[in-house]
Amino acid sequence: MIFQSFLLGNLVSLCMKIINSVVVVGLYYGFLTTFSIGPSYLFLLRAQVMEEGEEGTEKKVSGTTGFIMGQLMMFISIYYTPLHLALGRPHTITVLALPYLLFHFFWNNHKHFFDYGSTSRNSMRNLSIQCVFLNNLIFQLFNYFILPSSMLARLVNIYMFRCNNKMLFVTSSFVGWLIGHILFMKWVGLVLVWIQQNNSIRSNKYLVSELRNSMARIFSILFFITCVYYLGRMPSPIFTNKLKQMLETNEIEEETNLEIEKTSETKETKQEEEGFTEEDPSPSLFSEEKEDPDKIDETEKIRVNGKDKTKDEFHLKEACYKNSPTSYSGNQDISKLEILKKEKKILFWFQKPLIFLLFDYKRWNRPMRYIKNNRFENAVRNEMSQYFFYTCQNDGKQRISFTYPPSLSIFWEMIQRKISLATTEKFLYDDELYNYWIYTNEQKKNSLSNEFANRITVLDKGLFYIDVLDKKTRLCKSKNEYLQKDHDPLLNGSYRGIIKKTLLPFINNDETTVKKLIDEIFINKIHSVLGNCNNYQEFEYKKDPFKKNPISSKIRHFVTLMSQFDGESTFNQKGISLLSEHKQICSEDPEIFFKFLVDTIIADSFTQTIPKESIGIKEISKKVPHWSYQLIDESEQEEMENEKQVSWPHQIRSRSGKEVVFFTDKQENTDNPTPNTADISEQADEVVLTRYPQESDFRRDIIKGSMRSQRRKIVIWELFQANIHSPLFLDRTNKSSFFSITFSRLIKRIFKNYMGKNPELDISNYKEEELKKKEKAKEHKKDKEKKQEQIRLDIAETWDTIPGAQIIRSLILLTQSILRKYILLPLLITGKNIGRILLFQLPEWSDDFKEWTSEMHIKCTYNGVQLSEKEFPKNWLTDGMQIKILSPFCLKPWHKSMIRPYHQDKKKKEQNQIDAFCFLTVVGLETDIPFGPPRKRPSFFQPIFKQLDKKIEKLIKGNFQVRKRLKEKILFFLKLQNETNNWIIEIFPFFKKIIRKMSTVNTIGVFGLKEASSEIKSEKDSRIKNHMIHESSVQIRFLNQTNSSVTEKKMKDLANRTRIIKNKIEKISNDKLKMSPKKTRYGTKNLGQILKRRNARLIRNSNYILKFFRERIYGDIFLYIINIPKINTQLFLESTKNGIDKSIYNNESITKTNKNRIQFISTINKKFLPFLSTSKNNSKIISDFSFLSQAYVFYKLSQAKILNLYKLRLVLQYRGISLFLKNEIKDFFGTQGITNSELKTKKLPNSGMNQWKNWLKLKNNYQYNLSQLKWSRLVPQKWRNRVTEHCEVENTNLYQNEELINSKKHLLLLPDQKYNFQKNYRYDVLSYKFFNYKNKNDSYRYSYGLPFQVNKNQEFSYTYNYNINNNKFIDMWWNIPISNFSYLEKTKIMDIDKNIDRKYLDFKILDFSLRNKIDIEDWIDISTSINENTKTEPRNYQIVEKINKKSLVYSTIYQEIKQSDQKNKLFDWMGMNEKILSRPISNLEFWFFSEFFSFYNAYKMKPWVIPINLLFSNSNVSEKFSKNKSINRKKKTNPFIPSNEKKSFELENRNQDEKELVSKEDLGSYVQENYEKDIEEDYISFIDIKKPIKQKQPKSVIEAEFDLFLKRYLLFQLKWADSLNEKLMDNIQVYCLVLRLINPIEILISSIERKELSMDIMLDRKDFNCPNWKQKRVLIIEPIRLSIRGDGQFLLYQTIGISLVHKSKHQNNQKRYSENVDKKFLGERNKNNFDLLAPENLLSPRRRRELRILLCLNSRNNNGVNTNPMENRVKNCNQFFDEKKDLDRDKNTLRNLKFFLWPNYRLEDLACMNRFWFDTNNGSRFSILRIHMYPQF
């Protein structure tokens, strides 16, 4: 065994090391690069094939050497930087490559040009050998850069980033390439030897010599074709579209704008020196820059004062008041601009270097689409890489980072150049750097830990805890002044304001754009001044201009004006009253109006007092790379030309299309009777459509001059293929291929034929088949039409795609038109009339030429749009044309008379309308539509032949008598034949009867067998005949319905015959029975007859046998294959369930306990017993039962008999079980003899010291405690049934108010239900004792009776207190179930989880009216499960939950349970024994998300004051306040008071609440009597949340009702649409008032008359629902996003459990709150409190994360490069809970610290750690699943 393990281990490790070594990987990648065969191989193969003799061998050697040297240089250039830069620069390679190519072609085509006549054999002097060496060397270098090669050659570069020993990798990859190259050359040599030895090739010596002589020319041609093919893919480096005009204009504009800025800056300084500044209001009013788009975040090199500066120096412009005295209408520096333009035109060509003329690095050199951005006129360079590789320090070591900032790396390189060599040598080595990094991390960790511990100690002293909290980091201007909140980048949330800044569009300084400037810009400026003063009052730069001088009265006049025309650019009001002195300004001249408006605002607001300091906004912007060009497409160019703006040639290719003019409207000029042609062209209105070809346009939206896309894997098999695509999408095309028929379709087709209908029903399906045939014919016709249409379109596209084809076609059409009109048709007319003359008939010259003249040829566009007769379409020669023939001429043999009957005349007119026009084809034929098939014309000779037939018939009619006699003779013979047939039919039965009588007795045959029974044979014959007659009768019945008279007659004859035959056969059979009714005779059967019958029977039944066999195959095999996954999954689920059950019981106990089966623990089905092993190991398994409560398991085991449970000893003595068991349970099992004394003596751990660990042990008990509705959304039914098989408890200690219920109906419990109820009580007590086993207070003793036998002095029940802390909004960590997450949708439906498969009705679905049945909580009882029993109760119960509404943050719940007589307590099933109460709206709690009720108005008032998690806390407003409650409201509650004071205040409130509830006897009567006071008090409660200082400030009735309206219908978060303005809000308020009134009709009518209520906006009660509002865009409903999905319950639960810890700084309330509740319900408990504060919240989130990482990640274990930081973190986190290592250390500080740190980890923090801290991001969110959130024990 040792030897085998030694061998196997060594072999595996050795193989893994060899495979993963750098040498093997390098050899593999190098071998792969051999297959990247490029043009450089042509020279190598040329030398191998062509050269012979001694010189040929030298050339072969030199070619191979050059090839290898070139490849070696390429491999070295990967590692050696200077060589890589030299070979990688496109300028150098291209400049060297192009002359060398020319030289090479010149050398090959003129061989004797460099022939010096030297006969020396020295290879160094032979220039041709050297050229072979150079060719192979240089073209190996070109292969990577000038000629694109395959991806295989670049694999070496890819692996370089992963390899540490790069030089070894490069060497090994070169060796691998060399091996592959040698093998390739050997293979080429073998092929050449085979060619030389081939007899067929050697016999043709002449061809071989010719081929050898022309080999050089063939290789040069191949090389030239390859180079052209490769170079055709990339744009030419010299002849490119440089966009010179835009380049010049952009540069000139940049420089001129900078000059203007420079002059304005000098003016500013001068003016500041003089002591005053004058502001320029036009740009400064609106915080916008000039119209120059090039100012925005560009990185272009520009000239300022003779120095090169980048645009980065200018991208943080002050968008503020520029202190230059320029006006809004123009620029004072226009003269300077013109001078600069002239200078730049002269100096432009001299400043350009040669490289920029040849190569423009800013041009589009890849296939790129131009994406416009409205904010930036120039396009963003989106092909810039998001990754930048550079070395950086990570985990104390130098590593490559792919997200390193490029600017930082460049800056670091610049610094390194400046630093001397002496300083660079002082840098730390790798190991020293790593140790130093560890040391600094330890220092950071210690300092943070000490600070953290100090904060905790300060907090324990009871000081004011706000000073303990870590403050947020903020920027400050000085020591005493913070930076403004909206400008502070370290803040987030609502402090950061959003400034809507609309940049001005690109505007040219032309006269035509002045109107647009006035219309668009100035109104936006005015609106921004007036609008921003109201909206952004916190922004200082908006408030400062109006601090010293208020807004003048003139501006106030325009507030209403601007609000009406928000966003519009023009005013259309006829008369607008502006001021008293300006009464009306007509809107006919709006320019005067706007100028007046702007001048008024400027003069009034800003020229009276001028601030000394200009206010600037430092814009926080991100630098985005842009192209230096502004490109436009054809449509934009046309728009600019139409608007007479300065346009430039378009550079973006549009889709190739043709403009089709289908309507031209020419308006005649009435003023000018002889208009010019120019006037006509201006007035002509053309309606144009663009026609695009159906082929794929690969050039659309591509910039001119950019490289075309290198499309691969596209197969073109047709000469003209419209839509080319990859074979990958072959299945999506319409063409049916062989591969599209899948195997499944083939199977279906086979079995469909054999499993079809019976052949007996074929006759009855005759009509259906006829209908199917007709449908198929219709489909075939449609398909034919589609094919013809496709052919027509293909022909049209073919003419379009072939270059020059339209010119040829147009000329051919014109010649065909002339030939038809003037040559062909006149010749036909003359030939016809000459023929008539020769046949002695009158000619029809006039008629024919009349029809000929009516034919007109009209030129049409390519699409067939008709023009005038003499007018040609535009660009007809290039775009194509059609010729339409109106009234086409058709040659007729004669013309009929004009007088015809009416119906013939009508048909003729219809035919003429059809043939009214046609189109001429290229061949000269006629077609109905362009490029359609040629139509058939009536034949010229067809009417002539018809006339000849008529003549012949007349001749035949002359011999009518002869024909009559012949006919009589024929009829006589036919009649005679019919009579003989009838006679034979009558005689046939008589002969048949005689034959049957003779055949009854047969002679003995050869084999001597017995007689045959004639009866059996006759029965068989009659059966067969009856079968045939039945078929014919069915056929007769069906065919009698046909309309044909001939078939009808035949069918009647057949029916008569069959009837006669049938009657005679029946008569014969009856006679036979009379002759021998009882006697059975046996006839003889020979062997041949028997075999013949069996053969026939087998043949007859073989079809049915085969059919049955196929059906069985299909039904058994294929359906079984389909159901295999289902069977496997079912077996797996059942086996897991049985395995779990078997681990609890064993086989014997199962068989004995089957009679008393309980629904929570499933027994093993006997069917699956063979699949389960019965070994002892399985009996010891006790796995994580996520669906079983362990306490319940032990409880059920305690109820079982001793004999059945004696084998549970192994289970109960399992290691770790003692931690779960209480002493009472151990004693009980000990009395049963199941456990031993060891189990009882084990010491329990201190749960107060290690609560998190205890919760982890118990975490599986209730992690899937979901309600029925939530389970139905998460998992399938069967799995749900298994998981939810744990007990849940009913809240039966609910003390209801009988006076308020006022119900006489009682639902009596059945005995079974009572038993189950008692069982739940027992488990309730057991589970409470189980969880709270650390509590040593044994003053309570539990029993199993229905009413708990407890002290009467105690006013509490343990039924409600086993999970008391569940309802706090900050929960204990060991007690967080998944039901806490369901606070959002707290179901008011009874949880009927005890019977899981039971169907029940959800009462929330029912439609209740708005006024009646409102208080749903009053008549639906709440029954909660084991983790939900202290949730919100309805208002008519005495469990009253109090909340102090004065504080926005602090939330407490006080519960009081009154002990009452248990005899009157009845089980309330679904709350149906209560009366449905009619309550007003004011007593309503909104029933969907009632947790939002308490903080609704406060959150609406100031949303960011309250942490959002408080809305999800379990706090509900109870409306049953007593009169004494107002006393508590008067006291101001401060959430930030110290803990001692606050505790006393809470105790005082608690005592008052107890007195209220004890003294109150009838809560329902109190609510009914004090109805109006309750309404008022309800309103005041909301006001108190908003205004906690003031006691009572009641709202108006409208506001209060409006709040209630929103409270009622706020089922989702409502996001108001923009259309919901003040008018709609007024309507809502009136509507809310009306809802409460008893008789609202009068107020409705009056409000409608006063126009306060609009019935168009508001909806009536029937249509009052959210979908209608959503359709009318009144509301946008955004439901709360819950992270619940049907899969991944584990991740769902863990995420919820982690995220439930509250993030608020006020979590210290949790401790005081838990103490109050515990003292109230349980009396004085131990000092080991379970609810402790999470002290890490004292730190800020950033420092908290830093502390976590420094503590959790042991930096000394993080050694390797490939180690996973997640795994290291998990490994170290396990040490927190290791009792041997960790818990024995400093118990007072370290253990408590780590205890609180790890549970408060959040999932998002872990994700951030993965992405940012470790600088890695694998793009997979599933990497988080590798985290072991809870360590194993």
Swiss-Prot record:
Sorted alphabetically, which InterPro entries does this protein's record hold?
TIC214 (IPR008896)
Query: How is the protein disposed in the membrane?
Result: Multi-pass membrane protein
Q: Which GO terms are recorded in the biological process aspect for this UniProt protein?
A: protein transport
Which parts of the sequence are annotated with region: Disordered? 254-301
Q: Which residues belong to the signal peptide in this entry?
A: none
Family affiliation:
Belongs to the TIC214 family.
Sum up the protein's function in the record's words.
Answer: Involved in protein precursor import into chloroplasts. May be part of an intermediate translocation complex acting as a protein-conducting channel at the inner envelope.
- Assembly: Part of the Tic complex.
Misc. remarks from the entry: There is a partial copy of the N-terminus (positions 1-481) of ycf1 in the inverted repeat (CAB88779).
Record protein name field: Protein TIC 214
Q: Please give the organism.
A: Spinacia oleracea
